[in-house]
Amino acid sequence: MLKIASAGDLEEIKNFCRNNPFGAYISCRAVAYGFETGFSKLWCGRSKNDELVSVVSSLGGNAVILAKDGCDNEELSFMISAFSMNSVLTDYDTGTKCFSKRFQKKEIFRFDGCDFKLNEIESEPEMKDVYSLFLSCFPESYQADKDSYLSWLSDFVFRKNRKLARIKAVVLDGKVLSAALTSAESEDCAVISSVACNEKCRNNGYGKAVLLSLANELKAEGKNVFVISENRSVSEFYKKSGFKNCGFAAYTERHNNV
């Protein structure tokens, strides 16, 4: 049965979420935002033997689910619908059992290792310029208004100050040419997202440079590094950058009628 989690569940949740990209999101949110905030919620699902079998994390209505054998898929499906989640991300097997309508199938990659060096890599770029780059590359995910930028910035800085997020960028002559950041970090895992490169500078290795700078730094810290690929062309980019397929994710948004 799914029940609202409390701070006393944190260590059990972190252990349950180890070595898993969805678990990285859940652990990162739990550590960063806790259990008592209005926009961040966590639920734990337990078996009849009181064993933890599923965790649901919702941040601003965007949910991530990690479920294992013995979870109640019908209860998860009902919860997704009842709480009108804006979006839901989970593993492919759970998605096929819990999403009643269509969803996107995404490829998951894990970093095996690949060397690539570029001197112009920075860890403290001008964030407004980074946001502008992300906006130009991912207009469906980023908004041009000031409030959206400030909300994104405050969330990233909040997590970065707690060592739950980081960024790498190529900056030449004061201009951000490419950037990549982690959307989630836990004690043993990290998920890299938003690898962006200025359209005029593509095919020069700048996107690969920030991706590998970030991935190698995380790997050196003993973390498993994951990316979740949006499409086939991006998947090829990851394959050429030292990442190997390790599974599939399922993603849906509210308009798909979960």
Features from the language model and the residues they span:
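Conserved active-site alpha-helix within GNAT-family acetyltransferase domains
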Residues: D93-F103, K208, N231-F248, H255
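A conserved beta-strand-loop-helix scaffold within acyl/acetyltransferase catalytic domains
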Residues: A32, S58-L59, S141-A196
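Acyl-donor-binding surface of acyltransferase catalytic domains
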Residues: V56-E120, Y251-R254
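Conserved acetyl-CoA-binding loop-helix of GNAT-fold acetyltransferases
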Residues: C71-M79, S194-C197, N203-E217, K240
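Short amphipathic alpha-helix that is part of the acyltransferase structural core
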Residues: M1-Y25, I108, D112-S151
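Conserved GNAT acetyl-CoA-binding A-motif
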Residues: S84-Y92, L211, L218-E230
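Cytosolic beta-strand hydrophobic patch enriched in CBS
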Residues: L42-S47, I167-V171, F226
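Conserved donor-binding loop and adjoining core beta-sheet/short helix segment
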Residues: M1-A5, N15, P21-A24, C28-S81, ...
